[in-house]
Amino acid sequence: MSLDSNSDTEFELVPKFQTQPTRGDAPKSPELEEVSTVSDLQDELKSLRLENKDLYSLMEQLKKDNDEMKKSLEKVMKNQAELGELEEIRAIEDDKRSEKLATELVAIRADCSSLNRSERECRYDIERIFAKLEEESFFSLHENPIQRTISGTWKVIKISNFDEFFAAQDISQFHALIIKNQCLYFKVNKHQVKTQSYHERSWKPRAREEIHYFNFPNSLGELYSVEKNKLILTVTQEENDKKKVISRVERSVVDGQMKEIWERNGVICERIFKKIPDQRDSRAYPRSIYGSESQNIYY
C-alpha cells in the first residue's frame, strides 16, 4: 500500500510480496499484516500533522517577529530622520550664531581701532604736555638759567695762565692764536646745543656750526651737559679699553660775562668772554656733530 500525494485520507491497498517465513518465526496472516501497516501509516500521518502544526506556529511567530522588526526599523528610520532634521536645524542655528559672532567681532575690532587711535592721540597730548612742563622746568631751575643766558655770540677779552697751558698741549702756534682771539656762538634748547667757533677776522669765511645733543657724545667723544647752572663740555678718548677724560670745559655767565675754566692735560686755563653782536658769516654752513676735526681742541 502507498500514500497518494494529492490526499492524506485516501489509501490504496496493494498486494505485498510474499516472504518466506524465517526459521523460528511463526507465520502471519495477510489480514494482520495489512492492519499493522495501516496503523503505522496513521501514526506517521499524525506525527506529520503535529510537525506541520509546529511549523505553522513557528511561521506565525516568525511573521510576528518580522512585523515587530519592521516596526522597530520604521521607528529607527523615523528617529534618524528626526535627528537629521535636528542636525540641519542645529547647523542653521550654528551658521546664524557664527554670522552674529563675526559681526560682533568686526564691531569689536572697529572699537579697538578707535580706542587705539584715541589712545595714541591721548598719549601724544600727554607727551606734549610733559615735554612742555619739562622744558619749562628745564629753564626755570635757576633765576638766570645758563640755557638762556649763554645763548648768543661771545668774544675772548681776557685769558689767564695761557703760557703754562700752551706749553702742556700738543698744539701749534696757529691754534694758540685762535685760542687767544676766539669767538664762540651758542644756541641752547631742550635737547641740544648749537655751537660755532671762528676767528673774529680771518676765520669769518670758514665759520662752522655744529649740533651737539645733551648727554650723547659725538664720534670724537665730545659730550655736552648742564650741571649746577654751568654748560659742561667733556672730551674722552679710549686708552686700554677704558675711557679717559682728556679735556673738560666749564662755562658760566656771571654779571653779563661768560667765564670759562678749561682743563686739559692736567693744566687749567681761564678765559673771560663778553657778548657781542652776531658777526657770523652768512656763508657759514651747518655741519653734523660727526664731522668735527681732530684738531678741534679749542671748543
Swiss-Prot record:
Molecular function GO labels: lipid binding
Superkingdom to which the source organism belongs: Eukaryota
InterPro entries, per database record: Calycin, Fatty_acid-bd
Region described as Disordered: 1-38
SUPFAM superfamilies: Lipocalins (SSF50814)
Family the entry assigns: Belongs to the calycin superfamily. Fatty-acid binding protein (FABP) family.
Protein name per its UniProtKB record: Uncharacterized protein EEED8.2
